[in-house]
């Protein structure tokens, strides 16, 4: 009988060592090495005698295996193994197929360490599991110690609350995926491209005036990055070439808006009149939108000229030169946003804007108390020809002070039309009552216990809650807590 080319594989020897390395005897050699700064990721190095394509399957606990396929035929492959469970003997199956259709399959065990003790217990309420948008929820999570010290814990969880990826390296505010499937992360005044193994691929931007809060990637391959205008504070945007990292131009918002307009909500930093905290691109008309927290304003700006297209926000204290740009509210119900974060242009309809409305005080003259206030997501429809704005959707008001979030927050459109809303900085005193961020009598940040809820809802009016992620410290007598700066829904393995 004619032997096929895989018959000499038997007997096979599989070796498992502490560093999760496995060798299978020739003509196929497979080694799996855990990543250094992404401990739930690994690299499978495969050498075969004949050209093969490769499928890697990571067994899930809930009939939800992860799979990636490399269709190119080669004798050597380096395949990312993503989505391993912590503290688990993970089953990973590798399927090799030759050009003439013969296959070879081998399952191996990859052991991982438990999560660091600082990680929270993540609770999941799955209200409508069939409606959950696919992918992992990437959380820009962080832990507050009793003394206020902060530790970033960026991670990704599945729809059962299991951590399936986390990163231990240096990171600032920014963690955004780009079309290549890699991430852009902030390291000081630098934006670095990083893969899901935690490898730094390239420096994509270096901004001498600083980087903070957010960035967006344009259709023509550039980064728009929140920075500071020269000798100022968090009131600038820079445009950077995505390949060369060259700074192409800057936008000084002291020359675009009115730095003398009174801030609301206020801040402890005297120079912080605007506090840019979110940016998105509107590629259909070569513009971008930014969120200025301390002006409670979202502004659309022409990329070429830096001219204002419109201003979304309350009409109080604007000088005459800006009145022509103020959008007029139409229809009921309608509420202005206050202290907002994370504006997002709808991916199919540039007239629609979704943002997170923190709701700080909601007035210049008659502030709403935290226990009577609310935070949430709100969607507006903007008619630029008429310079009008209509509120078309909202979620969060029904929870009032229970999820009041005076700082940070996020709101995203999902691919299945759902929305992902991040009540990322729910602040309470040790009695459990909601509180504001600052104590202006003492000119200090309030002592507070911080928690986060990330909620997926439908786009209906009223919205139906699909899933809720609850991240809280369990000790009511401690100031230890957790925040989520932003949350995004991405697949671990991105199909390009």
Q: What are the language-model segments listed below?
A:
Residues 18-30:
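Membrane-interface motif at the C-terminal end of an N-terminal transmembrane signal
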Residues 8-21:
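Hydrophobic membrane-insertion alpha-helices, especially the h-region
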Residues 62-64:
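Short, solvent-exposed loop/linker segments at beta-strand-coil boundaries, enriched for Pro/Gly
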Residues 28-54, 58, 77-78, 89-496:
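Histidine-/acidic-rich catalytic cores in large beta-rich domains
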């Amino acid at each position: 009988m004619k032997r096929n080319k895989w018959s000499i594989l038997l007997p096979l020897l599989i070796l498992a060592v502490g560093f999760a390395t496995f060798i299978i005897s020739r003509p196929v050699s497979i080694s799996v090495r855990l990543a250094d700064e992404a401990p739930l990721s690994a690299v499978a190095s495969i050498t075969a005698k004949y050209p093969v394509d490769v499928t890697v399957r990571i067994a899930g606990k809930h009939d939800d295996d992860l799979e990636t396929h490399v269709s190119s035929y080669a004798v050597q492959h380096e395949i990312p193994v993503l989505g391993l469970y912590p503290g688990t003997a993970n089953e990973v199956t590798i399927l090799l197929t030759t050009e003439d259709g013969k296959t070879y399959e081998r399952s191996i065990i990859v052991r991982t360490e438990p999560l660091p003790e600082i990680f929270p217990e993540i609770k999941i309420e799955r209200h409508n599991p069939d409606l959950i948008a696919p992918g992992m929820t990437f959380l820009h999570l962080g832990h507050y110690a009793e003394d206020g010290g902060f530790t970033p814990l960026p991670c990704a969880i599945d729809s059962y609350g299991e951590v399936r990826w986390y990163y231990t390296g240096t990171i600032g505010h920014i963690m955004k995926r780009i079309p290549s499937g890699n991430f852009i992360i902030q390291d000081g005044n630098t934006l670095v491209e990083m893969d899901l193994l935690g490898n730094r691929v390239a420096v994509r931007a270096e901004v001498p005036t600083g980087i903070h809060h957010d960035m967006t990637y344009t259709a023509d391959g550039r980064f728009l990055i929140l920075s500071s205008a020269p000798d100022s504070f968090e009131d600038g945007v820079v445009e950077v070439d995505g390949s060369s990292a060259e700074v192409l131009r800057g936008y000084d918002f002291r020359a675009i808006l009115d730095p003398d307009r009174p801030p609301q909500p206020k801040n402890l930093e005297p120079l912080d009149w605007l506090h840019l905290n979110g940016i998105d691109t509107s590629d259909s008309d070569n513009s971008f939108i930014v969120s200025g927290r301390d002006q409670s304003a979202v502004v659309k700006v022409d990329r070429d000229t830096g001219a204002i297209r419109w201003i979304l926000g309350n009409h109080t204290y604007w000088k005459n030169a800006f009145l022509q740009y103020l959008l007029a509210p139409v229809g009921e119900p309608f509420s202005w946003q206050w202290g907002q974060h994370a504006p997002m242009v709808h991916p199919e309809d540039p007239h629609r804007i979704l943002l997170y409305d923190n709701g700080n005080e909601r007035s210049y003259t008659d502030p709403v108390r935290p226990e009577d206030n609310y935070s949430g997501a709100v969607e507006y429809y903007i008619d630029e020809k008429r310079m009008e704005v209509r509120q078309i959707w909202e979620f969060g008001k029904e929870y009032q002070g229970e999820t009041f979030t005076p700082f940070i927050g996020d709101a995203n459109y999902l691919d299945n039309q759902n929305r992902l809303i991040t009540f990322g900085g729910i602040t309470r005193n040790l009695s459990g009552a909601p509180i504001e961020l600052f104590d202006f009598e003492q000119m200090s940040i309030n002592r507070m216990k911080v928690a986060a809820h990330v909620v997926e809802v439908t786009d209906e009016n009223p919205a139906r809650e699909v899933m809720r992620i609850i991240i809280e410290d369990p000790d009511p007598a401690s100031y230890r807590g957790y925040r989520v700066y932003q949350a995004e829904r991405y697949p671990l393995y991105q199909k390009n």
